[in-house]
């Protein structure tokens, strides 16, 4: 199965030119204005006091720039960035090995921090509060505890599921930042900047055409830019115009809403096979030819967020936006009662 261009999760193509496209300083970072404003104040205050920045949680959907912000914080504080993830830290010793390599003002970035196990979390508590590491040497009656001092560092945790963080861990973060989806204009700025770095000429109209199909996500915007650049180099004299972007993305099967073939197949199944719904998720997965979990976790969230489908107690239903998007006419005049719908019912 080929990798999905409009997924917000990281895929192979994202590693190409990844670091060159990332801003290094906070004033170069586009979007997330409220987060930037707060972090800028906290960073300057920490610098004036000659202290480490307080520990930070960045939470929100994938692909919105959490790792980039962590790198910027490390640069602004004059430290190095060390990156790991919750699933990669299996034992307390794994975390201890990382903590003992840190220097003053370094930033330890833990992606998917909600997936840390509890024994690892317990090592983090004194490290975050008192900058000390308690380790046990030996076993049984002969064991003894040793306390090691750690340099003043900043822990940055990233999560897509803030509610899954344990209360003791969450309470130890002094700065909580909610990452929001980007506007089309912000994504256009990011695309123009990235195109310049990649050495590809792009018009504002071409950048906007890519931006509006990028699902509010910089990772997707840069990914689509790289693919459209290929078309531009071969077919359009290395220039991404509005027309070049539109035709390239049509070939890539990414439509004007940022939907791909499966997104549209889901809408078509609900409307054409079930008269707009309601239809159960198991039945829908069968008609689309995808796993149930894939429908729920990968495709459905964006369709819900954009208002193209709704969840009701009896199943999924297509909205008027979905009918209009597919050029269909709703023959059933009954409207969906929003009071009977919820985004959280299965």
UniProtKB/Swiss-Prot annotation:
PANTHER family: HOLLIDAY JUNCTION BRANCH MIGRATION COMPLEX SUBUNIT RUVB, PTHR42848. The keyword Signal does not apply. Belongs to the RuvB family. It catalyses: ATP + H2O = ADP + phosphate + H(+). InterPro entries: AAA+_ATPase, AAA_lid_4, DNA_helicase_Holl-junc_RuvB, P-loop_NTPase, RuvB-like_N, RuvB_C, WH-like_DNA-bd_sf, WH_DNA-bd_sf. Its EC number is 3.6.4.-. ATP binds at residues 21-22, 63, 66-68, 129-131, 172, 182, 219. It comes from Clostridium perfringens (strain ATCC 13124 / DSM 756 / JCM 1290 / NCIMB 6125 / NCTC 8237 / Type A). This is Holliday junction branch migration complex subunit RuvB. Homohexamer. Forms an RuvA(8)-RuvB(12)-Holliday junction (HJ) complex. HJ DNA is sandwiched between 2 RuvA tetramers; dsDNA enters through RuvA and exits via RuvB. An RuvB hexamer assembles on each DNA strand where it exits the tetramer. Each RuvB hexamer is contacted by two RuvA subunits (via domain III) on 2 adjacent RuvB subunits; this complex drives branch migration. In the full resolvosome a probable DNA-RuvA(4)-RuvB(12)-RuvC(2) complex forms which resolves the HJ. DNA binds at residues 311, 316. Residues 183-253 are annotated as: Small ATPAse domain (RuvB-S). It is found in: Cytoplasm. The RuvA-RuvB-RuvC complex processes Holliday junction (HJ) DNA during genetic recombination and DNA repair, while the RuvA-RuvB complex plays an important role in the rescue of blocked DNA replication forks via replication fork reversal (RFR). RuvA specifically binds to HJ cruciform DNA, conferring on it an open structure. The RuvB hexamer acts as an ATP-dependent pump, pulling dsDNA into and through the RuvAB complex. RuvB forms 2 homohexamers on either side of HJ DNA bound by 1 or 2 RuvA tetramers; 4 subunits per hexamer contact DNA at a time. Mg(2+) binds at residue 67.
